[in-house]
Amino acid sequence: MTPEQKAKLEANRKLAIERLRKRGILSSDQLNRIESRNEPLKTRPLAVTSGSNRDDNAAAAVHVPNHNGQPSALANTNTNTTSLYGSGVVDGSKRDASVLDKRPTDRIRPSIRKQDYIEYDFATMQNLNGGYINPKDKLPNSDFTDDQEFESEFGSKKQKTLQDWKKEQLERKMLYENAPPPEHISKAPKCIECHINIEMDPVLHDVFKLQVCKQCSKEHPEKYALLTKTECKEDYFLTDPELNDEDLFHRLEKPNPHSGTFARMQLFVRCEVEAFAFKKWGGEEGLDEEWQRREEGKAHRREKKYEKKIKEMRLKTRAQEYTNRLREKKHGKAHIHHFSDPVDGGIDEDGYQIQRRRCTDCGLETEEIDI
């Protein structure tokens, strides 16, 4: 734009603002905001490094003219700017590159997450040799500085102290083996059935807390047989909340024999289940009475279901009979033809023999051709 066009544009802008001010459309705050918005941009120092540089930047900022050829308004605030920067205080509204560079990079949130695009980052992967050799297994105060040297020396063996190894072996022994034998055989616990054998069945002893040997557990299946959860519910009429209560019954869990994805199989010892069932139903007689009551209930429900089916069939038959009667009243009774013996009807134009039959009731005549 030429200087004449700029001057004309500025004059028109001032006239428009004056006209709006006279009409009372614009307030004083709005006028000040418009004036500050239309002022030329003020240059400011890019960075503050030292006292001499700040003075040079301030001096350079004083002599920068605006686009109208007039001195910038920043020259009027030279002293304020110099004192502000000289004191080392940076205004929060002014962006300082030196301050921004000092921000910690770990707090800056990336715009793109790497895990959304990279599933396997080979730069961060570690070679564990199929899971058999882990460099992290070495001790912190180990003499090996290189992981390859550690792997070549120990291989898949985890480096540990003698105390750690003894502690681990003791834990494995307590977990997978029975308790050590007593000091004297007379003090050893004996089987509660035979009172002779001191070697207990590990499953009954460790899981169900019963001092029974293997021979006695096989000779008395009516006491020490293992029952599934379904058998407990069907034979002793126990509910799921009762069987799931760990305070009432000991249980042995195994993988489901039907499928590995099914719920785990739970086994209960018969003597515990019987004792709780007798207490619940009032002894063996009460359990038999409950079984008889449930069998009678099953028979009653079966008979009730049969009667319901018979009733539905009768209603259906009655409705069909009623429909047939309405059809007979409207269209008459359905006629069934009774044809007479065939009579020779001659030969047709194609040379085939024709036989005629006639209904004895309505006189309907049909022709049959023997091909």
UniProtKB/Swiss-Prot annotation:
UniProt binding sites for Zn(2+): C191, C194, C213, C216
Family: Belongs to the XPA family.
Gene Ontology cellular-component terms listed: nucleotide-excision repair factor 1 complex; nucleus
Additional note from the record: Present with 1030 molecules/cell in log phase SD medium.
Stored CDD domains: DBD_Rad14
Zinc finger (unnamed): 191-216
Main localisation: nucleus
Name the UniProt record assigns to this protein: DNA repair protein RAD14
Entry keyword Nucleotide-binding: no
Protein function: Involved in nucleotide excision repair. Binds specifically to damaged DNA. Required for the incision step.
Lineage of producing organism: Eukaryota, Fungi, Dikarya, Ascomycota, Saccharomycotina
Bias (Basic and acidic residues) ranges: 32-42
Subunit structure, interactors included: Two monomers bind to kinked/damaged DNA (construct with only the C-terminal DNA-binding domain). Component of the nucleotide excision repair factor 1 (NEF1) complex consisting of RAD1, RAD10 and RAD14.
Location(s), subcellular: Nucleus
Domain of life: Eukaryota
Molecular-function GO terms, alphabetical: damaged DNA binding; zinc ion binding
UniProt-listed SUPFAM superfamilies: Putative DNA-binding domain
PANTHER family: DNA REPAIR PROTEIN COMPLEMENTING XP-A CELLS
GO biological process: base-excision repair; DNA damage response; nucleotide-excision repair involved in interstrand cross-link repair; nucleotide-excision repair, DNA damage recognition; UV-damage excision repair
PROSITE patterns: XPA_1 (PS00752), XPA_2 (PS00753)
Chain residue ranges for the region called Disordered: 26-48
Pfam families in UniProt: XPA_C (PF05181)
Organism listed in the record: Saccharomyces cerevisiae (strain ATCC 204508 / S288c)
InterPro entries: DNA-bd_dom_put_sf, XPA/RAD14, XPA_C, XPA_CS, XPA_sf, Znf_XPA_CS
